[in-house]
Amino acid sequence: GYVLKYLEERGRHVSKAEEGRLAMGLVGVKRTTGQHPGGLVVIPQDMEVEDFCPVQHPADDPDSGIITTHFEYHSMEANLLKLDELGHDDPTMLKMLEDMTGVNVREIPLDDPETMRIFKTAAPLGLGDDDPIIGKTGTIGIPEFGTGFTRQMLVDTQPEQFDTLVRLSGFSHGTDVWLGNAKDLILSGTASVKETIGCRDDIMLYLISKGMPDKRSFKIMESVRKGRGLPEGAEGEMHDAGVPDWYIGSCRKIKYLFPKAHAVAYVMMAFRIAWFKVHRPLEFYSAYFYRRSQKDAFDAGLMLKGRDFVRRKINEIKSKSDATAKEEDLVTTLEAVYEFYMRGFEFAPMDLYECDAAKFLVVDEKR
C-alpha cells in the first residue's frame, strides 16, 4: 500500500518485481509509537534520558505530557534499569476484606483444611459437585483459579497441598507447560503432579538432586525457561544422571516458565481470598461484586432477577458462537452471582438512606 501510493503520487510506473523490491525495504520499519503504561525506565540522578537515547511523545502527539524512549528497551537493557509496575486487583480486594471483617490477612493460616478443600470440591460452600454451572470445584471468583481453564486444571489434578497450587499457577502462566505437556503426562499416569515441571526453579532443583553440577543445572533451567530448548550436550548429561525421557521431552516443548516466587505470591493472595469465601462469604461476595462493578462487569438489572434468570442468561451467552468479549466477561460475574444465590444469599432492595454510593454492604446474615 505504501509503495503504490508513493508511485501514484509521483506518476511513476514500475514492474511488479520493482514494487516487491521497494516493499521489502519497508518491512520492519516503525509506523507509529506506543507505550507500556507500567514500564518505567530509571535514569541515574546525575544524568538525563537524552544521554542514553532520543525521546518522543507516544503516538507522535506533541501535546502529550508523557515522554517515551525512542528505542525499544531491549536495545539499551545492558545500560538502564526498567521496572514493570503492573496493577494488581488482589491486594485491593484483601484490604477491603480486612476492613470489612477486622481479620488480619497475614494471620490467615495457609493450611486451613476447609479452604484447601474448595480447590477439589464445592462441598465446603454447602454445594454439590454436580451443578453444570458451578462445576466440581468451589473456586469461582478466586484469582488464579476462577477461570474455566484453571477450574478444569483443578479437576484434572485434585490438589491437596499448597505446593500443588503453586505448581498449577506455574502451569497456567507458562507457555506450552500444561496443554500438550504436563497435562498429558499426569492424565496418562506417566508422572505425578509433583514430578512434572511447573516453575523454572523446578528444573534446576531437580537436576541438582540428580547429582548434576549446580552451574550446569542453572544453565539448563535458563535455556528451557526462555524457550530455547536444551543446550548442546545437555540431553546426554541428563540421561547419564538418570533423568527420564519424558522429563527431557517436556523440557523440549516448553516456551516460557514462570518463576516460583511469583507463583507463590499469587497463590498466597488467592488462598487468603478463598479463606474469606469459605468463612466470611457475604463479605467475600461484597468485595468481589464491587471489584467487578469497577470494571463495568456488573449489570445490576440482570443480577437482581434471581437464580433462574441468571442461570438462563449464562446458558444463553455460552451457547452463542459469536459472544462478544463483554458478554464473556459478564459470564464471569454471572457465575459468581449464581453461586451466591445457590448458597442461599440474596440482594437486599435498594435503600436510598442505607446504600453506599459504590460499594456493596452486608445487611444481615443472608443479604
Listing of model-derived features with the role each one plays in the protein:
Residues 1-367:
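Noncatalytic, beta-rich nucleic-acid-contacting surfaces in large DNA/RNA-processing enzymes
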